[in-house]
Amino acid sequence: HIDHLAKVGSLAGLDETFEKAKHANKNSPELQAFDRNGMRIDAVEFHPSYHDLMDLAISNQVHNFAWHNEGDSGHLGQSVLTYMFSQAEGGVMCPMAMSYSVVPSLRSTPGIEAEWMPRLMSNNYDPRDIPAAEKTGVLIGMFMTEKQGGSDVRSISTFAVPIENNEGIGASYLLTGHKFFCSAPMCDAFLVLAK
């Protein structure tokens, strides 16, 4: 792993990487609520430098290194990659960290694991606004925080009701509630905390 970590550290420390981080942060994402015909699209446009940084992180396994190297100091390597890349640009690290940390939840549900893990384990950055099933790589975000509870997850009020009398892991649920905050809304799927 030392060679990979050294390579990523070298890339993260380049002047070019810091320049891209500067441009990505100077040019905030912009919501494009409608297309030119007035149809609702709710797309988020990012500066090209942001996409370059996302590609750099994903192509170097900053989001999934631990899962490609389980039992071989993979999580330690994941921590090192996270630390090094955070020095260059912290905003990119949010979708990286969420995608990394969602894996145990995905693995608890075989059908969902089979559907999502191959694309989550991909090292391809695919920013296209298309269905996740058509993408070469995905990112997974999280909806946890609610106004009344902040980071106290015990006080959440969002609840899940099974659809079509199917209950349990892997079933479909109707979610009702209000999440106050979402990092990285351009992710392809979301883990949502509900009762």
Q: What residue spans do the PLM features occupy?
A:
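Internal helix-loop-helix
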Residues: 40-131, 183-184
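Short, hydrophobic/aliphatic alpha-helical segments
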Residues: 75-84, 163-169, 174
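A short core secondary-structure module
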Residues: 170-195
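Internal maturation/activation junctions in enzymes
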Residues: 112-163, 168-171
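Hydrophobic residues within well-ordered, non-membrane alpha-helices that form the packing/core
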Residues: 105-106, 144, 194
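Extended, charge-enriched "interface" segments that sit outside catalytic cores
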Residues: 1-71
